């Protein structure tokens, strides 16, 4: 197997609630990447900032997140690096802590966080609906898992992705 991916990690500090500013920063970073970078990865809940608390319960905020994610979709139409980015999303009547995989002008996959913490400022069980155990995603012919934060410590999640 000679397949390889070049991945850039965007270790950015998003501002909670500054959805447009966070997206602009990520698009700017992506525009400066070398053409040989296959994937740009941003942190959990990067789009909204974290910890998000009750802001994510507002319908207008979730609508803004959705419209700003579309800007990321549009910028990937250049067929350069894919983007993996964390954002809250509305799924029917529930809100999920998700990761979006965006490539070639499309959202090719959405994965939801399974293991929601409920300690201190991490009040995710009150805010988010638990995701299901997710399968792997494939980018450029390479299959890999996308556990989100505490999912890494959950044996059930890792077994599903292995």
Task: Report each predicted region and the residues it spans.
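Enzyme catalytic cores with a strong preference for nitrogen-chemistry domains
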Residues: 1-162
């Amino acid at each position: 197997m000679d397949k390889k991916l070049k991945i850039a990690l965007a270790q950015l500090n998003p501002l909670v609630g500054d959805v447009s500013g966070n997206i602009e920063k990520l698009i700017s970073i992506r525009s400066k990447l070398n053409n040989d970078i296959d994937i740009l990865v941003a942190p959990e809940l990067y789009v909204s900032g974290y910890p998000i608390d009750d802001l994510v319960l507002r319908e207008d905020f979730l609508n803004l997140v959705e419209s700003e994610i579309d800007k990321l979709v549009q910028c990937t139409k250049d067929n350069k690096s894919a983007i993996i980015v964390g954002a809250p999303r509305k799924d029917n009547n529930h809100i999920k802590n998700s990761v979006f995989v965006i490539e070639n002008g499309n959202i090719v996959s959405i994965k939801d966080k399974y293991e929601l913490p409920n300690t201190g400022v991490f009040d995710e069980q009150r805010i988010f609906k638990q995701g299901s155990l997710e399968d792997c995603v494939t980018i450029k012919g390479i299959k890999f898992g996308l556990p989100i934060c505490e999912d890494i410590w959950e044996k059930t999640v890792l077994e599903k992705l292995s």
